[in-house]
């Protein structure tokens, strides 16, 4: 009788056995897209600035950006952002858009605030991370923002976001 193997185990073995060389480019081509911008929100961390005290606690998230867009100085970047940074980013986007020739870009609502008592529970933090990831993917996926928003570039690539 054959031993049961999960799909992921089988795939992992196949990938390990596969050659690591990149396949030759074909005329039909599945090359890297001409222009791309990928963003991820992951690795939430809760910080305790005052030791064991709950005073001043906050959670931040790792924002990873991969792109080949000419308006982005770095091809790959990682920055940490708090929820309040996302709120500030949204306000800065509104201001930038109101001063530009494209004020009709719709910026979706951020995921809602969390009840104070539950904001550091793991499942609540994960739910917020998922919401922020979806929100940022939507915003960063807008073609007008990809090509013309200096605020988007700074939010995704500057170590400290100042708007």
From Swiss-Prot:
One GO biological process term: late endosome to Golgi transport
Keywords: Cytoplasm, Golgi apparatus, Lipid-binding, Membrane, Protein transport, Transport
Gene Ontology CC annotation, any one: early endosome membrane
Keyword Protein transport carried by entry: yes
All residue ranges annotated as the PX domain in the record: 39-162
Subcellular location: Cytoplasm; Golgi apparatus membrane; Prevacuolar compartment membrane
Protein family membership: Belongs to the sorting nexin family.
Name of the molecule in the record: Sorting nexin-3
Organism: Eremothecium gossypii (strain ATCC 10895 / CBS 109.51 / FGSC 9923 / NRRL Y-1056)
């Amino acid at each position: 009788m054959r031993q049961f193997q999960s799909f992921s185990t089988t795939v992992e073995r196949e990938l390990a056995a596969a050659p690591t060389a990149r396949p030759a480019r074909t005329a039909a081509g599945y090359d890297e897209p001409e222009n791309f911008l990928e963003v991820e929100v992951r690795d939430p961390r809760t910080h305790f600035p005052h030791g064991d005290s709950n005073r001043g606690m906050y959670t931040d998230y790792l924002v990873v950006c991969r792109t080949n867009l000419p308006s982005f100085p770095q091809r790959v970047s990682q920055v940490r952002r708090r929820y309040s940074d996302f709120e500030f980013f949204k306000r800065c986007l509104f201001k930038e858009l109101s001063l530009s020739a494209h004020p009709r870009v719709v910026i979706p609502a951020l995921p809602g605030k969390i009840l104070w008592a539950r904001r550091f529970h793991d499942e609540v933090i994960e739910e917020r991370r998922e919401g922020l990831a979806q929100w940022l993917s939507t915003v960063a996926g807008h073609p007008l923002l990809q090509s013309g928003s200096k605020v988007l570039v700074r939010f995704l690539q500057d170590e400290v976001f100042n708007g």
